Amino acid sequence: MKSCPKCGQQAQDDVQICTQCGHKFDSRQAFYRKSTDEDIQTNNIKMRKMVPWAIGFFILILIIILFFLLRNFNSPEAQTKILVNAIENNDKQKVATLLSTKDNKVDSEEAKVYINYIKDEVGLKQFVSDLKNTVHKLNKSKTSVASYIQTRSGQNILRVSKNGTRYIFFDNMSFTAPTKQPIVKPKEKTKYEFKSGGKKKMVIAEANKVTPIGNFIPGTYRIPAMKSTENGDFAGHLKFDFRQSNSETVDVTEDFEEANISVTLKGDTKLNDSSKKVTINDHEMAFSSSKTYGPYPQNKDITISASGKAKDKTFTTQTKTIKASDLKYNTEITLNFDSEDIEDYVEKKEKEENSLKNKLIEFFAGYSLANNAAFNQSDFDFVSSYIKKGSSFYDDVKKRVSKGSLMMISSPQIIDAEKHGDKITATVRLINENGKQVDKEYELEQGSQDRLQLIKTSEK
């Protein structure tokens, strides 16, 4: 369609004269317009053909850009750079994230220790060089899948391994720190509380039993901890150093605010060694001059005393109090017995025992003769006065005499004797009719006018 320039009437393109005003249209202008429309149509067709190619080219450019972006963050070299940057910048949180595995969670404090250990035991420059070389070799190798970075002393400090691929094109490198188990071996049952893997942890170790406290990556550790025993609660640290271990475990050194007590006794020479006891905070224990007692918390007073027996009588020292301010890791204390009191008692008892032994020697000399006479004469009356009537021993000897089964005895020796009230226990060494030496224990009763009579006997 076209418009008449004179009256504005619409007309078809091929019309030469306006039907309304008779104006004659210019044929050249119509031809030009037709040619222009055909050119536009042709250009539109060309543009429509070029659009898919342009889109494809744009997508290709995007893919290339994306590839380089992915390579910058996911290639083995990029993965290495992330770890190196974290260690160089002491980024303990990033290192903890990179080294944590499903089985072993590494917290930021462990990572901090690990970073320092690398710098001290490998050297940052050497570590970076070793790591880059290791990653490069693994990336190029078709057979090797893992390798270790080591310290100057040859200990493994980082495991580098292939772990599948990232985005099809890039080898996925896995960085894992090897672990060891720190072990404790307390003298008594102990509960340890500390932080590990970002969480609070509690370990209970039995007395004199090796107990691991967890899995830790390489480092020199000084972990804040609390420990509890029957003696109290202690604040301090658990210390262990990977440099001091060539095995899968590493010994823990305990560093707590504790006191160990060494006890010296004076005035105890007359006491029976096996009877000596030490009582600390109401807890009684056997005494040994070579033993240290504890540990005990350094923030609480300690009460201590000692006891021992002489001739079955118990003697005790005064109770001493060691102030918390006087407690040290190794604390020595001396406890004094009243030696004069003990010696007087022992002397008195020894006189009594000698007197008793003399009586028993006389008694058993007569008893052995009477026993043998009863055997030879088959007459119980010879020995009856030495045995308490009504006792089981009385009836037993009487029966043996009648049956002729009474044993002959000779050469009685008093080995030991104790008196408790009117009862006396004596260990007597005899020679029987077969010529064999035997020890027998007799129980006697002391009656009126100090008369002794046997109640029972048994083999030692």
Swiss-Prot record:
Cited Pfam families: TcaA_2nd (PF22813), TcaA_3rd_4th (PF22820), TcaA_5th (PF22819)
Write out the GO cellular component annotations. plasma membrane
Stretches for region Required for teicoplanin susceptibility: 49-177
**Transmembrane residues, as ranges?**
50-70
> Which domain of life does the UniProt lineage start with?
Bacteria
Which residue intervals are topologically Extracellular? Answer: 71-460
| Keywords, sorted A to Z | Antibiotic resistance, Cell membrane, Membrane, Metal-binding, Transmembrane, Transmembrane helix, Zinc, Zinc-finger
An example GO BP is:
response to antibiotic
Mapped zinc finger ranges (C4-type): 4-21
Which Gene Ontology terms cover its molecular function?
zinc ion binding
Q: Which residues lie on this side of the membrane: Cytoplasmic?
A: 1-49
What are the cysteine partners in each disulfide bond? none
Report the InterPro entries cross-referenced here. Mem_prot_TcaA (IPR023599), TcaA_2nd (IPR054529), TcaA_4th (IPR054530)
Membrane topology note: Single-pass membrane protein
- Where does this polypeptide localize? Cell membrane
Query: What induces this protein's gene, according to its Swiss-Prot or TrEMBL record?
Result: Strongly up-regulated by teicoplanin and vancomycin even at lower concentrations (10 ug/ml). Induced by oxacillin at a very high concentration of over 1000 ug/ml.
Q: What happens when the gene is disrupted?
A: Increased resistance against glycopeptide antibiotics, especially teicoplanin.
Q: Which family does it belong to?
A: Belongs to the TcaA family.
Its annotated function is as follows: Plays a major role in decreasing resistance to glycopeptide antibiotics. Overexpression confers oxacillin hypersusceptibility, without affecting the levels of resistance towards vancomycin. Could be involved in virulence. Overexpression increases the levels of teicoplanin susceptibility. Overexpression also increased susceptibility to oxacillin in methicillin-resistant strains.
> What is the protein name given in its UniProt record?
Membrane-associated protein TcaA
Q: Which organism is it from?
A: Staphylococcus aureus (strain COL)
